[in-house]
Amino acid sequence: LERTFYIIRHGQTDLNKQGIVQGRGVNSPLNAHGLKQAEAFYERYKEVPFDRVITSTLLRTHQTVEKFIASGIPWTQHAGLDEISWGVYEGKPQDEEIMSGFERLVKSWTDGMLDVCVDQGETPDEMKIRQESAMLDILELTKSDKLVLICTHGRAMRMLLCLLTEQSYAVMDSFPHTNTALYKVRYDGEKFTIDEFYNTEHLNGLNE
């Protein structure tokens, strides 16, 4: 039953670079630098005999692990791994008004108010329900697998790591992320243990 999940965030998109809010409702592709990050991750981990690749339904995660998929590893998309919905903020530049709104929102979350969200967006409580359901599906899907590559999104990854380590989503910011950063998480059939925390070694020497 033991298996290891390599959980990564997608590569850079132009909207990441421009500071535009993406979220679940924005389906932007990787930019040239994001494709380089994906290539660097592939070169570093292509010898790992992954049994399965699981991504969100959004293009940026598909492109990040495209070479693993192209090599013939079975691939599953799961909407439960999609980014949080940022509601009315999605697709908008992070100007002062949006940034201050973001800061207030994340402060509320880290203060334990997990039932608040951007107008028309998702709350951490709603994300937890979505991610719990996704992980039940994923554990069932991977029960005969040993090594699984998961590509998801920044905020979604932080929240998922809280879920897997049985911590409140209020501590989500204790899990740093950057594009293609890796968390290696082992499952022993009962609980999850983080074996590698925020590994970005594959990005060494990669300039924008």
Question: How would you describe each model-predicted region?
Answer:
Residues 1-4, 84-96, 140-146, 162-208:
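Acidic, low-complexity terminal tails and accessory targeting/binding regions
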Residues 13, 156-157:
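Short active-site segment of divalent metal-dependent hydrolases/proteases
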Residues 55-56, 129, 151-152:
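Short beta-strand scaffold positions
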Residues 9, 14-73, 77:
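Active-site-proximal alpha-helix that buttresses catalytic centers in soluble enzyme cores
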Residues 4-10, 150:
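Short, hydrophobic/glycine-enriched beta-strand segments
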Residues 39-43, 128, 132-140, 161:
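Generic structural signal for well-ordered alpha-helical scaffold segments
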Residues 49-80, 106, 186-208:
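Conserved histidine-centered catalytic loops in small-molecule metabolism enzymes
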Residues 71-130:
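Phosphate-handling substructures
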